[in-house]
Amino acid sequence: MAASGEGKRRSRARSKLVQALYQYAVTGASAEDIERQFLAAGLGDIDVAYFRELIYGVTDRAAELDEQLSALLDRPLVQLDPVERSILRLGAFELSERLEVPYRVVIDESVELARRFGADQSHRYINGVLDRFGATVALRAAERGERKSRRGDRQ
């Protein structure tokens, strides 16, 4: 049960992170300023440590993540809606840096965030891009391959 509670708190943290990363993308405010604003407004029952780690991690690596993601997109990154760009950055960061979070959890959470905050059908785009991104993360290859082979066994 504890893991379930922790998972829900992380899900809520991701929801706040998308909002914070959107603000970062649109305003260019620093991670410190955004963190202060979110803490002052009250974050509710979320994993605050996870929120803090990821707001700084994603913003510190934004240019690198953007470069990696750009190679997988069908259009320039700047043409993506800031919400989708924020979700992609968050998902890419988790896939590459938070290896204890299962691959499928990162993808599923990102898809749900796109359904909640993104444009109609953006969840499909997010799913495809992050799945391709996961293939570029060497340490995710075994986990991703295992999932794909199990899917193939069912067909």
Swiss-Prot record:
Keywords: RNA-binding, Transcription, Transcription antitermination, Transcription regulation. GO terms for biological process: DNA-templated transcription termination; transcription antitermination. One of its GO terms (molecular function) is RNA binding. Gene3D superfamilies: NusB-like. InterPro entries: NusB-like_sf, NusB_fam, NusB_RsmB_TIM44. GO terms for cellular component: cytosol. It comes from the Bacteria. HAMAP family: NusB (MF_00073). Involved in transcription antitermination. Required for transcription of ribosomal RNA (rRNA) genes. Binds specifically to the boxA antiterminator sequence of the ribosomal RNA (rrn) operons. Belongs to the NusB family. This is Transcription antitermination protein NusB. It comes from Halorhodospira halophila (strain DSM 244 / SL1) (Ectothiorhodospira halophila (strain DSM 244 / SL1)). The lineage of its organism: Bacteria, Pseudomonadati, Pseudomonadota, Gammaproteobacteria, Chromatiales.
